[in-house]
């Protein structure tokens, strides 16, 4: 009632959501965009507009949003001349003007303008974009904008985990990100905010637990409970352990990489052995399957352990493994048994090593040093956000490359080209008709069809 202005801010946020099942769900970034626009009473193209009272009166006080804010996407248009003769219309290149403003000189490197005003895209536009000085400068400016951001997050979150004001911190971090993005073109700051918010959901829960239960809760271990079926009923049972704050996998990846690598190598070899065994079965000929029927299952797609072991044991009483020529039934059985035995040993070894690593992880968490805790919290809280934020420039550049490629493909094949291809195909088909034979009626029909193809 006391406002100086009588304008009404109308916002169309109907495009800002994600699908959640059957429902449309606003993300934190969508909500933040709405709040900021309303707070600033800002005019944003295709999103919001300050509408005068007089304009509303002229519309008989009809407040239907599309009357005032058109959020629809521009329809795709097709240039008649370009469709007939090729080339890319200047106005369609102009539609990418935000990129040309952000990357000076790039447009001229990508397109050769012909005397008729239409352009041709140069070869390998993706490589031109990737190597252009303005694009490289954009990437470097973005990287510099976030110099020290990891240290900033560490100081605010990790170093002050017991005292940081959780309810206020997300907004402080948001303002820092927005400040860093000032002057960086093309970046949607609300996409960056969404990345922060998604990570903050995890960080804030951890911070609240640390402040509620004390710093030592970081060293706490809890039973890992899972729901399993027992006698037809769901029952919660313990399946190992888990860190209350620090997940086991982060501890293992950060503090015991050699042990994790050793298990990964065993798992890789197990996968290879199982592949080789499957490939061995798949390569069997029908004759092989007949000769090996005693050691194969009814579907002939797997070896049976007991008869296979028995047959190989008999073979080894009278000969050495290397005595058998590759491809013989004896060689195949020995190879299959060796692969099965190797797989069995690998599975046992992997299971034992994983149990040892889990036990070591549990003991390690319980005696973590302050330095180790800082390192692990950095890995859980900060590194995922830094990784997401660092992907923004490449996403923007990929979008531009896709748009240029689409423009190039749109008019690459003209109607004249298509007509030529059709005529060529019709001519080839008409030629093939001459080689066909049939009854008099069939030949008459083929002759008429050939006439149609010839356009006579």
What are the residue ranges of the model-derived segments?
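A conserved structural/catalytic subdomain of Rossmann-like adenosyl-cofactor enzymes
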Residues: 1-248, 262-263, 267-269, 276-285, ...
């Amino acid at each position: 009632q006391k406002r100086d202005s009588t304008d009404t801010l109308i916002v169309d946020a109907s495009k800002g959501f994600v699908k959640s099942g059957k429902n449309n769900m606003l993300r934190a970034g969508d909500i933040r965009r709405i709040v900021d626009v309303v707070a600033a009473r800002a005019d944003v193209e295709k999103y919001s507009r300050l509408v005068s009272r007089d304009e509303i009166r002229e519309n008989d006080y009809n407040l239907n949003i599309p009357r005032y804010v058109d959020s629809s996407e521009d329809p795709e248009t097709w240039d008649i001349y370009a469709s007939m003769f090729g080339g890319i219309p200047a106005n369609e290149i102009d539609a990418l003007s935000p990129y040309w403003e952000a990357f000076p000189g790039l447009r001229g490197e990508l397109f050769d303008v012909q005397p008729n005003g239409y352009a041709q895209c140069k070869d390998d536009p993706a490589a031109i974009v990737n190597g252009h000085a303005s694009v490289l400068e954009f990437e470097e400016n973005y990287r510099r904008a976030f110099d020290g951001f990891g240290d900033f997050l560490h100081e605010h979150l990790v170093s002050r985990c017991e005292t940081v004001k959780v309810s206020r911190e997300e907004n402080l971090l948001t303002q820092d990100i927005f400040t860093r993005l000032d002057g960086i073109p093309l970046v949607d700051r609300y996409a960056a905010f969404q990345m922060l918010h998604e990570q903050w959901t995890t960080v804030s829960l951890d911070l609240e637990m640390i402040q509620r239960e004390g710093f030592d809760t970081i060293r706490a271990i809890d039973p890992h409970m899972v729901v399993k079926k027992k006698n037809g009923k769901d029952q919660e049972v313990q399946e190992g352990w888990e860190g209350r704050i620090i997940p086991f996998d982060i501890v293992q990846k950060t503090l015991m990489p050699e042990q994790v690598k050793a298990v990964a190598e065993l798992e890789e070899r197990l996968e290879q052995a199982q592949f080789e065994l499957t490939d061995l079965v798949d390569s069997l000929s029908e004759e092989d399957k007949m000769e090996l029927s005693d050691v194969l299952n009814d579907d002939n797609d797997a070896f049976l352990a007991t008869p296979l072991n028995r047959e190989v044991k008999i073979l080894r009483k009278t000969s050495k493994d290397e005595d058998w020529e590759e491809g013989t039934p004896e060689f195949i059985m020995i190879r299959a048994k060796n692969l099965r035995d190797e797989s069995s040993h690998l599975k046992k070894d992997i299971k034992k090593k994983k149990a040892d690593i889990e036990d070591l992880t549990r003991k390690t968490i319980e005696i973590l040093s302050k330095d180790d805790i800082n390192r692990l919290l950095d890995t859980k809280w900060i590194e995922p956000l830094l990784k997401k934020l660092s992907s923004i420039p490449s996403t923007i550049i990929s979008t531009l490359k896709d748009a240029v490629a689409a423009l190039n493909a749109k008019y690459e094949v003209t109607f004249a080209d298509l007509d030529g291809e059709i005529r060529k195909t019709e001519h080839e088909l008409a030629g093939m008709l001459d080689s066909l034979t049939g009854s008099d009626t069939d030949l008459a029909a083929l002759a008429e069809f050939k006439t149609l193809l010839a356009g006579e």
